[in-house]
Amino acid sequence: EDADSKSKHKPANVIDVDKDGSTDDDWRRANVDSVICNLYKAIQEVKPWVRFGMGIPGNWTMKSKAAAAYGISLPSGISAMESYDYLYCNAVEWAKQGWVDYLNPQIYWSTQVTRQNYRVLCQWWSQTVCENFSNKLPNGQRVQFCVSQAAYGATDADAGLSGYGDGVVEIQRQIDANRDNLSSGYTGSVFFNTSSYILLFKDLKESHFQHKALIPPMDWKSKTQLSAPTHITLIDTLLSWQHPSAERFTIYAYPRGMTFETAKNDPQYLKGVVYGYNIRLDGYGDLSQQTIAVCSYDRYGVEHAAAFYEGNEVFIPKQVIFWELNGGTIDVELPTY
């Protein structure tokens, strides 16, 4: 059946898989690669801000020959279903070529088992795949890495997943393992499935997700510089502003005297993402003693210029735009308001 399919659909300019020494499995992977590559390119042409990624089984392969072709090692002691061989999904190639915005390996095994250990696989994806490939793409592009975790293993005893007897504690151990790999590429968690995650939500909110967070930015795609919001007003707890083009904004409230950069790096000061031009800041303490920042926030998850409110005073820092011109730069300083 494969031979008939190859004979019917293989383009004339493609070398015969038998003659070049590759196998039917290589041919299948090449076809999957083609779908991923062409779909990614099509999305970039129409809506480049749409995030395109793939959820694949948490174990890439156990074949040393496949790893050697990419100059990488395999995770030690792992024995599990392989996406490379069973599904013909070569996620390492997608990361190397930058054909996806994110990879979502489904590591549905626990930290308590040996042959499919969560920590080992999480570290391999973030350090081996991200550091060797997705963090070395041209023009600042990165393939972001977020693990899919088996929330259902912690809530459904009938799921039969080994090592999940501790319930939410196992999920917390996994999140800790993820965060151990922040420097090499980890950007977040995906939980399967929603109904199970809802049962864990209260515990996780109290332990690991106490504050709001922004999605990882795709700053290499963002091309337009958004100006700061204007006409900020605060009436009681209703904060309002105006902007000619931006449609969503990030809001911060932090102690006066603290720098904005410091506040941005501490999630307790992020008060929300707003689609629109106002927000209620109820429950955030005495606003008269805080600096409130409103940041233009684009579709790529990139924060742009901010405006600041302190009491009745609104101020917008000087903004500098750089134009590249014949190898040099021209600095244009916009006025403050």
Question: Across the structure, where does each feature detected by a protein language model lie?
Answer:
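Extracellular fibronectin type III
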Residues: 297-331
